[in-house]
């Protein structure tokens, strides 16, 4: 009888340990490719007993998942799209978490000469003038939206470009692989580039223009629109993401001695 009681108690302990809370978070491919999730998720599990299931997609698709109530929160990087999401009543509030920047990558020989450009608009104009191979995400991601806005700011229409401009409809890692294989120019977030293992003959050629600022924000899905979402868990995760511990982990995350993100949440 004693063995049965002990066995039942052990089963209850095991069952309790197995029943950690779960929530679904849509994140961008650029965030996932950075490797930061592998640092944050185990600490979230340890501190909150919360399993965060990531759906890795572009910002546009992440927002559509939020609008459909298929996730509990989103972590994305396209402010205009985020504000439209909130205006439509799909999210409760937008909380800025961290930032990095976009950079222009290209062949080490830099036939278009963008390394000497004064700003991002000039760099893009030089690529277009040279007809140099350029790979675009082409996937409605935050990175793709930003790239298109930069072409437009330079007075250029990406839809009118010739065969030198290749939209691949893929995530950041796959797009970087394509650029590496083609020896082409590409715009990437800095974190994905630093964590990319197949650089080949590519190099970081241009960065530093303030227009290349890249802010990441967290938005819980509105439970009044989607009653089934786990809003309480989404809010717990938000509070963790703006904590001192999260700040230390985000600011301390480096590759080859270079920081990938800067924490800037207001608390």
Give short role names for the model-derived ranges.
Residues 1-4:
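Positively charged n-region of N-terminal signal peptides that target proteins for export
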Residues 73-99:
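Acidic, polar ligand-binding/catalytic clefts
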Residues 104:
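Serine endopeptidase catalytic core focused on the charge-relay Asp
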Residues 21-51, 55, 60, 64-70, ...:
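Exported/periplasmic ABC-transporter solute-binding proteins
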Residues 69, 100-101:
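Short, conserved active-site loops that position catalytic residues or coordinate cofactors/metal ions
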Residues 16-20:
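Sec/Tat signal peptide C-region and signal peptidase I cleavage site
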């Amino acid at each position: 009888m004693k063995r049965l009681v002990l066995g039942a108690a052990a089963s209850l302990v095991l069952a309790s340990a197995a029943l950690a809370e779960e929530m679904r978070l849509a994140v961008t491919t650029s965030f996932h490719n950075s490797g930061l999730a592998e640092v944050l998720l185990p600490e979230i599990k340890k501190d909150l007993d919360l399993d965060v299931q990531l759906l890795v997609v572009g910002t546009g698709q992440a927002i559509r998942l939020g609008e459909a109530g298929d996730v509990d929160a989103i972590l994305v990087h396209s402010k205009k799209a985020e504000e439209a999401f909130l205006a439509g009543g799909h999210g409760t509030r937008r909380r800025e978490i961290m930032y990095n920047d976009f950079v222009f990558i290209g062949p080490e020989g830099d036939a278009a000469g963008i390394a000497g450009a004064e700003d991002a608009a000039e760099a893009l104009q030089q690529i277009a003038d040279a007809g140099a191979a350029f790979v675009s995400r082409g996937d409605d991601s935050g990175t793709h939206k930003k790239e298109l806005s930069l072409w437009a700011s330079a007075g250029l229409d990406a839809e009118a470009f010739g065969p030198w401009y290749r939209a691949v409809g893929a995530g950041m890692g796959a797009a970087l692989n394509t650029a590496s294989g083609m020896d082409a120019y590409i715009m990437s977030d800095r974190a994905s580039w630093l964590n990319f293992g197949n650089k080949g003959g590519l190099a970081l050629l241009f960065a530093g223009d303030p227009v290349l600022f890249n802010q990441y924000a967290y938005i819980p899905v509105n439970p009044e629109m989607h009653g089934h979402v786990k809003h309480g868990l989404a809010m717990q995760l938000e509070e963790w993401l703006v904590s001192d511990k999260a700040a230390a982990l985000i600011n301390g995350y480096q590759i080859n001695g270079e920081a990938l993100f800067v924490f800037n949440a207001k608390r």
